[in-house]
Swiss-Prot record:
SUPFAM superfamilies: C-terminal domain of RNA polymerase alpha subunit (SSF47789), Insert subdomain of RNA polymerase alpha subunit (SSF56553), RBP11-like subunits of RNA polymerase (SSF55257). It comes from Platanus occidentalis. HAMAP family: RNApol_bact_RpoA (MF_00059). Residues 267-337 are annotated as: Alpha C-terminal domain (alpha-CTD). Coiled coil: none annotated. Keywords: Chloroplast, DNA-directed RNA polymerase, Nucleotidyltransferase, Plastid, Transcription, Transferase. It is found in: Plastid, Chloroplast. In plastids the minimal PEP RNA polymerase catalytic core is composed of four subunits: alpha, beta, beta', and beta''. When a (nuclear-encoded) sigma factor is associated with the core the holoenzyme is formed, which can initiate transcription. It catalyses: RNA(n) + a ribonucleoside 5'-triphosphate = RNA(n+1) + diphosphate. The N-terminal domain is essential for RNAP assembly and basal transcription, whereas the C-terminal domain is involved in interaction with transcriptional regulators and with upstream promoter elements. The lineage of its organism: Eukaryota, Viridiplantae, Streptophyta, Embryophyta, Tracheophyta. Transmembrane segments: none annotated. GO terms for cellular component: chloroplast; DNA-directed RNA polymerase complex; mitochondrion. This is DNA-directed RNA polymerase subunit alpha.
C-alpha cells in the first residue's frame, strides 16, 4: 500500500494519487485528488469522470465457447465435476488484458485428471491473463478437455443472445468494464474570501488496468468527446447556419485516419494512441516507458531511435513498421535528418 499526505496547492490545478494498493490480482484500488477547484467545478468533473470510468473504458473478455461434444448448455459431461453452465460462468469471470482490435480466437486443450485454470488458455500474443489461478473446471478422470474460445475487446456490458447451439457454440455474457466501481466526494474549504473545493476520486479495477491507467484512459476519452468542438471552426460546423437540418458529422477513429490523408496529420496523430494498435504487451510497454504514447510521438522517432530503447529488438521495429504500413500506409525514416 502507498499513502501520501494530502497537501492542497493554491496555485496550479493538479491531480495527485494519495493512496494506491493491490488487494489481490483482480482488485486494485486508487484514491486521487484534484485541487484547487472553484465552487461547483468538483461536482462537474466528478460526475463526468465517474461516467467515463464506468462506461467509456474498453476491456477484454471471453465472449463465446465452442465444443462439438457438448449437447446443450445445461448438460453434464462424464469426468468433469462442473456442468457446462458452470464452466461458462467460470469463463465469464476470467480477467484478460490486451490491446487487440475486435475478436480473436483462443483455445483450451488439456488432459485430465486435474484442474483446468486460466493458465491453460492458449491465446494470441497480444492477450495476457491477469490471474492464472482462476478456476475453470475440475477433470476427475483421464479425459480430453478441448474447447475453442472467442476473445473480444469492447466496452460496457452485453447480454448473450439466444442461440440454439446447433454447432456447439455457446455465447457468454460479456462484462467489458475493467473499472468495478468509482466514487467521488468533495471537500470544501475557504481560501481567504474565496470558497474552493478538493475533488476526491476513488477507483477500483479488476487488475487488467491500474486505477492510474484507468484515470488516464477515462480522461483521454473525455478529451476525445470534446475534440469536435475544438475543431468546429475548421470543419465549418456552425449551428446557426445549419438551416437545412443537415446531420452533423460523427467523429470516429476512421475519420482521424481520413484526416491523415488530408494532410491534417499532426492534429489526427496526436489523438491516436499506440494502445489502439495490435502491439504485443512487451513492445507496447517499452514504448510507453520511453514516453511514446501516441502515433505523433512514434512518428517523431526514427527506426534508429527505436533501436536505442532499452530491451527493444529489430523484430519489434519490423512489427511496428508492418502495423504502420497496414493501417496507415506510412513508414518511419531509418535515420533522423
Amino acid at each position: 500500500m502507498v499513502r501520501e499526505k494530502v497537501t492542497v496547492s493554491t496555485r496550479t490545478l493538479q491531480w495527485k494519487c494519495v493512496e494506491s494498493r493491490a488487494d489481490s490480482k483482480r482488485l486494485y484500488y486508487g484514491r486521487f485528488i484534484l485541487s484547487p477547484l472553484i465552487k461547483g467545478q468538483a461536482d462537474t468533473i466528478g460526475i463526468a469522470m465517474r461516467r467515463a470510468l464506468l462506461g467509456e473504458i474498453e476491456g477484454t473478455c471471453i465472449t463465446r465457447a465452442k465444443s462439438e461434444k457438448i449437447p446443450h448448455e445445461y448438460s453434464t459431461i462424464v469426468g468433469i465435476e462442473e456442468s457446462v453452465h458452470e464452466i461458462l460462468m467460470n469463463l465469464k469471470e476470467i480477467v484478460l488484458r490486451s490491446n487487440l482490435y475486435g475478436t480473436r480466437n483462443a483455445s483450451i486443450c488439456i488432459r485430465g485428471p486435474g484442474y483446468v485454470t486460466a493458465q491453460d488458455i492458449i491465446s494470441p500474443p497480444s492477450v495476457e491473463t491477469v490471474d492464472n489461478t482462476q478456476h475453470i473446471a475440475n477433470l476427475t478422470e483421464p479425459i480430453d478437455f478441448c474447447i475453442e474460445l472467442e476473445i473480444e475487446r469492447n466496452r460496457g456490458y452485453r447480454m448473450k443472445t439466444p442461440n440454439n447451439s446447433q454447432d456447439g457454440s455457446y455465447p457468454i455474457d460479456a462484462v467489458f468494464m475493467p473499472v468495478r466501481n468509482a466514487n467521488h466526494s468533495i471537500h470544501s474549504y475557504a481560501n481567504g474570501n474565496e470558497k474552493q473545493e478538493i475533488l476526491f476520486l476513488e477507483i477500483w479495477t479488476n487488475g487488467s488496468l491500474t486505477p492510474k491507467e484507468a484515470l488516464h484512459e477515462a480522461s483521454r476519452n473525455l478529451i476525445d468527446l470534446f475534440i469536435p468542438f475544438l475543431h468546429a471552426q475548421e470543419e465549418n460546423i456552425l449551428l446557426e447556419d445549419n438551416q437545412n437540418g443537415v446531420t452533423l458529422p460523427f467523429f470516429t477513429f476512421h475519420d482521424r485516419l481520413a484526416k491523415i490523408r488530408k494532410n491534417e496529420k499532426e492534429i489526427a496523430l496526436k489523438y491516436i494512441f499506440i494502445d489502439q494498435s495490435e502491439l504485443p504487451p512487451r513492445t507496447y510497454n517499452c514504448l510507453k516507458r520511453s514516453n511514446i504514447h501516441t502515433l505523433l510521438d512514434l512518428f517523431n522517432n526514427s527506426q534508429e531511435d527505436l533501436m536505442k530503447i532499452e530491451d527493444f529488438r529489430i523484430e519489434d521495429v519490423k512489427q511496428i513498421l508492418g502495423i504502420l504500413q497496414k493501417h496507415f500506409t506510412v513508414d518511419l525514416p531509418k535515420n533522423k535528418f
